[in-house]
Structure formats: C-alpha cells, structure tokens
Amino acid sequence: MATTKSFLILFFMILATTSSTCAKLEEMVTVLSIDGGGIKGIIPAIILEFLEGQLQEVDNNKDARLADYFDVIGGTSTGGLLTAMITTPNENNRPFAAAKDIVPFYFEHGPHIFNYSGSIFGPRYDGKYLLQVLQEKLGETRVHQALTEVAISSFDIKTNKPVIFTKSNLAKSPELDAKMYDICYSIAAAPIYFPPHHFVTHTSNGATYEFNLVDGGVATVGDPALLSLSVATRLAQEDPAFSSIKSLDYKQMLLLSLGTGTNSEFDKTYTAEEAAKWGPLRWMLAIQQLTNAASSYMTDYYISTVFQARHSQNNYLRVQENALTGTTTEMDDASEANMELLVQVGETLLKKPVSKDSPETYEEALKRFAKLLSNRKKLRANKASY
C-alpha cells in the first residue's frame, strides 16, 4: 500500500510536468539503490565491484570510488550496509571500503553474523557479533560525514513510523545524525532474524531522542529505489548545482537499482490447498516472503513505466537475478559453499541479457553507465573550475 501510494504521487507529479529538453549531462542526478537480502548482498556486491572497476578503467584512476560518481546512494537491510561501506570516510576522507572489499567482508564475517545463537522464543541470531563488527568498521562516524548523500531507511516500532536517514534531513531533524553503526545494525534487524535496536542521539541544544528500530524493509519492503529517487528529487530542487532542473523529470535522473535475487518473480509459490492447512506462524513467514517479492516486482514495474513515459528508459537499469535455486534463495545461509554459489550467481548475471527484448547484457549496460558517470563527473569538474 505504501509503495503504491508513493508511486501514484510520483506518477501524477510527472504527468503535471511540462515537456522539457533533456538536462545537461553535468546536471543530471545520479542515483544508486541497493536492495536488502541478508547474505544475498554478495550478488549486488559483485555488480558494484565490476562497475567500480569500469570507472577506474575509464578514468585511468585506480583510486576512483563509487561515491565519487553518485549523488545519492540508498539501501535497506544489507543494501544499507553496502551503502555505508562505500560512503563512510576513512582517516583520509575517502571511502573506507572499495567495492572489491565487500565480498571478502561477507566471507570473513558472514558465518559469525549468521551463527545460530537465539532460541525458539526469540530471534534466530542475537546480533552481538554483527554490532561488534559494525562498531569496529564504522567507528564513531555519523550521517553528516557520509561522502555523498545517502538514503537509508529503518522503522521505529515505538512510534510506528519509518525513519529515513539522509544528510539533507539533518538541518530540520538534527536528531537523525546518528552513528553509522547504530543505523546499520538497525536496518539489519529483520524481524525473526535479529533483535530490534535501541539507541539515543543528542542534539547540540541538549535534546535527547530515542530510537527503537528494525529492518528498513518493513518500511520500503526490500527495494529502496523509490525512496532513493525521492531523496534525489529533493536534492535536485535544493542544490544549485542542478539549476536546470525545475521540476521532477526522469530525463534528468540516472538510476541504477541492484537486487539481491529471487527464484522467479516471487520467491516461492504455493497452492490454495497447501495454504488452507497453514497456522498463524506459517502464514506470518509466507506473508513476509510474498510481500517482499511482490513489492520488489511492482516497484521495478512502476519505475520502468515512469521512465518509459518520459522517453528515458535508458536512464534506468535494474540488475536482478530471477532464477535463484536451492540455498541461494536463503538470506541467512552463510556457509562457504553457499557464498561461493552467490559469487557465481553475480558473475553469471553480468553475462545475461538485460531483458528478453534486448541483446544487451548487464555487463554491457554497466559499461555504458560507467561512461555516462565518468563523462558527467568530468563535465561537472570542468564547470566548477570556471
């Protein structure tokens, strides 16, 4: 329902927009969105590694990083963790993790994060190791220090409202300048898997704010692309760097959306005869699976429709594997064998066609995106030098 409402708002805003010429390349807003999915985050990590490698090759710069090219990077659950890894600064004010470091991170820490430590009456994992690793990696870094705009969603179970962490929100809501490790644990706290996370923030005027957060997938249902576009739209309206963008027009947006894979349009299918025998617990598990899959599919459909309506379909690329099988469909199977399979899935996905109607592979499409991102960055730099 929330996703449908968001789409309708965006759709009617676009219909109300008068036809305009395509934005200058240097003034296009570039957006990267990364889905949630637990250990399946290995799949988009492979895609990010390929893209960053292409950017380094095109610009002949081995130190090029994704945060140098995207105006907004958003994610939820494991996608939010990837967002933090590639936007959180190190002591040299550069991303503390290159894209090639993400898969090794999963291999090193995944088995400890997803090591059963709960009980039949509580979450499957106690989350202690996850929180410890996040504290070690992200330190005391806060939202305002992110190297580009971020859009990370969580959900507060005490206020029953989504909580969106972005740099641009901080002027009006300084309490949202939380530590990145608190945010990353919160967005990983998927119901059933990890316990909710409680923390407080303090503003400069001495006010204290309390948060009781769970996985952002509760708010964005796994696919944060609409949220990321919303943040990008606000950025375009407020930042003088995008002066030619007078209203919402997807000709002026460049969106890369990365999924964590499904085994069809829906993660699992059931018959009415099967479902008729389910009790409340079984229904709870099935509803979570079906809602996530259906919402991800519909979000992609909505966004594709809007970009096509503005004759800007080449400005949107959704990278998603729809043929996962066996253990690769599980968000918490961090066995080495399964993680190796997920790496293979990501590498194979690069060779697959973007759609049934197009011979272009994901690898070719990402190379095209890399050239656009590189050219835009150079034009932006040249404009700033005058």
Curated annotation (Swiss-Prot):
Extent of motif GXGXXG? 36-41
Segments forming domain PNPLA: 32-229
Secretion signal, residue range per the UniProt entry? 1-23
Q: Which residues are glycosylated?
A: 115
Q: Name one GO biological process term.
A: lipid catabolic process
Which SUPFAM superfamilies does the entry link to? FabD/lysophospholipase-like
Question: Known Pfam families for this protein?
Answer: Patatin
Q: Where in the cell is it found?
A: Vacuole
- Family per similarity comment: Belongs to the patatin family.
Q: Know anything about its domains from the record?
A: The nitrogen atoms of the two glycine residues in the GGXR motif define the oxyanion hole, and stabilize the oxyanion that forms during the nucleophilic attack by the catalytic serine during substrate cleavage.
Q: What is this protein called?
A: Patatin-B1
Name the gene behind this protein.
PATB1
